[in-house]
Amino acid sequence: MVVQTEPDVNSMLEEKVQYAKDLIADTIKKYPCVGVACSFGKDSMVTVHVARQVDPSIKIFAVMTQFKPPETLEYLRKMNDLWDLNTTVYMVADKVPDILNSKTLTVRLLPTDEFKTKSAETEKKYRDKIYTVVPDECCRILKVEPTKLAVANLDAWICGLRNTEGRTRVDYQYVEDKGGLIKVNPILTFTETDVWKYIALNGIPSHPWYGQGYRSLGCAPCSHPGGILERDGRWIGTSKCGGECGIHTQKLK
C-alpha cells in the first residue's frame, strides 16, 4: 500500500492550483468578457481567490435570494469589502437588504411579481411553501432567471464546481460549452480536503455555518448540516435532495 506523505499532498494541491490559474488565464485571453460566479461558499471563495491572482479586476457576480440566511449576506458584505471585489448582486426582491446597502456593492433588484404569484398559488393549493412543494420552480425564479441576466453579456463564466461534491457533479468537465456560453470549472478536481487546506494556507475567512456542520450552503430552508456527500444536505425531503438548483443544468442563453 502506498501512503501519501504531507509533502506529496501539498505538491498535488500546488499542481491543481497552478492548473486552475493557467485555465483561468487561458479563458481570459480567449474570451473578451469573463466573469466569476460567487455564492460565497467555500468553493466559490477559493475560485475567486485564485482568479484574482490572475486578474485582480475580474468581474464578480452573485445571485442572492430572500431565503439566504443573514449570515450569508453578512459574509458577502464582509468579503466584498475585505477583498475589494465590487460584486454585482442579482436578487429577486422589492428592496435591497440593509446589510447590502453599500457603495462597494451593486445590487440589481429583479421583479417579484412572478414569485409572489407562484408562492400564493402554491400555498393556497398545497398549504405549504413553494420551496417545499415545487423547489424546482422556486429555484428557477429566484436563481436560474437571475443568473441568465448575470451572464447575458458574458462570453464565459467561471464557477467553483467540483466533481466530488455530489452525485450530480461527477461528470462535469473543466470547460463546457453550454449553448454558446462557455462555463469554466477551474477547481473541478479539488477535493473537500483540498479546499479547506487552500483556505487555511491562504488565511481566507470562512462562512460561519461551516463551523456548525454544514458542508454545502444554499438558502436557509433548503440547507442542512451533515451528509455522506457534501450536497446531501441540500433540499432534504424534496425531489431535489442532493441535486441542483438548475443554473448548471439549464441553458442560460
Language-model region placement:
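Nucleotide-activated chemistry modules centered on ATP-dependent adenylation/adenylyltransferase
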Residues: 2-253
